Design a protein with these regions (language model features):
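Active-site loop/lid in soluble adenylation, ligation, and acyl-transfer enzymes
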Residues: 1-146
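Acyl/amide activation-and-transfer machinery of modular secondary-metabolite enzymes
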Residues: 151-157
Length: 157
């Protein structure tokens, strides 16, 4: 299920990423090609998805490095995971997923149907599943374990 990487011990897998630890306590974060949608891992994968996710992450960590510190130590990783992994400092995880929505769909649509808002952000009446929003909205969610659904949370929480 997970890679065997010399010098690294697998200790956790998420929906899309696998985590390994070395003797010094550093973390190897490996992005897989797994697909996760609606909080479930799909049976198929997307070739090179892990490499693309890693490149996107590195781009944003570099872009924001003058604004905020991050956990990345290096992108120089073992050859078996080159291009789809980073070495990181161990941190305490804040289990919140940051979602920016441009369209009303998924859990946002479900919440809207009950109270005409998503994560405490009021939206106009009459929207339909898949409606384009006038402007993107920030809708954080809890980061649930595999097999459980993330839950939208209000910005007031």
């Amino acid at each position: 299920m997970h890679d065997l990487i010399q010098g690294w011990t697998h200790f956790q897998s998420g929906k899309v990423r696998d985590l390994y630890r070395d003797a010094d306590g550093e973390i190897l974060l490996v992005a897989s090609d797994r697909i996760s949608a609606y909080d479930w891992i799909m049976p198929t994968s997307i070739p090179d998805k892990g490499a693309i996710l890693t490149k996107l992450s590195l781009f944003w960590f570099e872009k924001l490095s003058g604004i905020t510190p991050h956990h990345v130590i290096s992108s120089e990783v073992p050859a078996t995971v080159k291009g789809r992994a980073i070495i990181c400092k161990p941190l305490t995880i804040f289990p919140v997923e940051c979602v920016v929505r441009g369209y009303l769909a998924g859990s946002g649509w479900a919440e809207y149907q009950t109270n005409s808002q998503v994560c405490g952000v009021p939206l106009p009446g009459g929207l339909l599943d898949g409606s384009k929003l006038a402007e993107p909205i920030f809708t954080p969610a809890t980061k649930a374990a595999i097999g459980y659904h993330d839950e939208n949370i209000s910005l007031d929480r």
